[in-house]
């Protein structure tokens, strides 16, 4: 990769703490019904996938997330077309900001949990302190989502009453 294409892509720079409206368009940014998936939902899928890689809990996110990562990479490196041998987003240094947060989860969890109505992550912090790993989070408030992203490196999914959101909840978790 050239210096231009190896530039880091940071979700927190795209949506953290700023009052901006972003929408990414690519072949993978469409819902099953053909509507465009909101940017926040795209980042929820990507961040949950990256934080659950290597665990079975990444499965619900895997296909869509890998497509979205490809779209984002292609959009960000549009000026320079370069063949890459790298396999994962980590090897591209994409989204490294998701792992530079104050409250990362343990690599060897004792149990798994989901964080519904997450707020800024108080329940998650308590569960992580007990050795748990969060495999899904949702929060409808936009400001709380931004704080959650900066604290945990994950964009919580939005409205839990939507079927599209429910489809990403892993089947097998402990709490």
Identify the function of each model-found stretch.
Residues 2-175:
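Conserved active-site and SAM-binding loop architecture
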């Amino acid at each position: 990769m050239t210096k231009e294409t190896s530039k880091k892509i940071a979700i927190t720079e795209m949506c953290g703490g700023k009052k901006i409206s972003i929408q990414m368009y690519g072949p993978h940014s469409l819902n099953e019904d053909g509507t465009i998936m909101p940017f926040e939902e795209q980042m929820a899928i990507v961040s949950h996938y990256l934080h659950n890689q290597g665990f079975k809990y990444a499965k619900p996110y895997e296909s869509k997330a890998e497509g979205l990562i490809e779209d984002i990479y292609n959009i960000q490196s549009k000026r320079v077309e370069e063949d890459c041998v790298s396999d994962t987003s980590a090897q591209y240094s994409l989204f490294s900001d998701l792992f530079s947060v104050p409250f990362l989860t343990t690599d060897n969890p004792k149990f798994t949990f989901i964080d519904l109505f997450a707020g800024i992550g108080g329940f998650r912090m308590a569960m992580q302190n007990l050795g748990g790993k969060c495999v899904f989070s949702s929060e409808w408030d936009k400001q709380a989502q931004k704080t959650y992203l900066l604290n945990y490196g994950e964009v919580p999914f939005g409205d839990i009453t939507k079927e599209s959101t429910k489809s990403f909840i892993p089947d097998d978790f402990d709490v």
